[in-house]
Amino acid sequence: MKRQIRLKEWEPGTKRVMAPPASLIELSDGSLPPDSVKVTISDDGFVYDPNRPDVFGQRIIVMGDSVVECSYVPEGKRFTDIAEQELRARGISARVENGGRSGATILQLTLALQAKILPMRPNKIVLMNGIIDADAIQFASGLWSKGDYINPIEEEKVGHPAPKKLPELDFTARTKFLRLFADTCRLFEIDLVIATTPLRDNDEYMERYLAKNGQRNIRVEAVNQNTREFCSNNGVKLIDLDKLVNRDPRYFYDYFHFNPAGAEYAGRLLAKGLLA
């Protein structure tokens, strides 16, 4: 049986037009546009806007999951696009790369950092993940669980037993991978910023969501707190986007994915945080 370590990225050079599936629209609050959007992937496996400027002075790579990816937000209006536009408007010649990939865990992002990102020699990395970590930390197998998203190894799915659920959340491995990620950046002289994942709250949509997914809400909030504590304890710069966005439901189409208004708002907040 052939196995290989999973590199969590879009296939380089991909060009795709896609619309949100009906199932996703049904689960959203109505602010997810049903229109088709273009997804263009660079030769480095990043989601990007083909109309962005070619010239830049510094390279910032934002690594994360589907929240960073913003695949159903139009080109030029994604979270990272707005951050780059805002930095350029303030006189900073920056390229802000979208290294988001749906389902990425901190283990997978650490592998991508070491195998792919380091030789690019970026000036800065922004790490923003946690949604899938929140699913992994409830199992004894944790970040090595055999699920489609979590498994760091690509292998056949035959014969994998259901993961054993823990009586309480275990952040041990996640905290160590955050430390490994941060230490790797320090060793290779790359500035690291870590951001929390903005979450939604305080509206009828969330009342319905929590009625079905309350435990996930608790897990994701706990992961954000784990991120805050790690940054505080290890001297890593934190941009607390969860607190800055302030759970405002206008900026999400579900619990944590940005609609176009949210991508714009959070992108401006990210740029402001990078300049602080």
Regions found by a protein language model. Give the residues of each.
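Residue-level recognition of beta-strand->loop/alpha-helix junctions
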Residues: 98-102, 130, 196-198, 240-243
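Serine-dependent acyl-ester chemistry module
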Residues: 129-228, 246-249
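N-terminal secretory targeting modules
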Residues: 1-61, 74, 120-123
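Loop/turn elements at helix/coil->beta-strand transitions in domains of secreted/extracellular proteins
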Residues: 58, 92-94, 121-125, 186-192, ...
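Membrane-embedded segments
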Residues: 47-121
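Short, amphipathic alpha-helical "lid/cap" segments that border enzyme active or binding sites
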Residues: 106, 110, 171, 175, ...
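Histidine-centered active-site loop/cap adjacent to the catalytic His
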Residues: 34, 237, 252-276
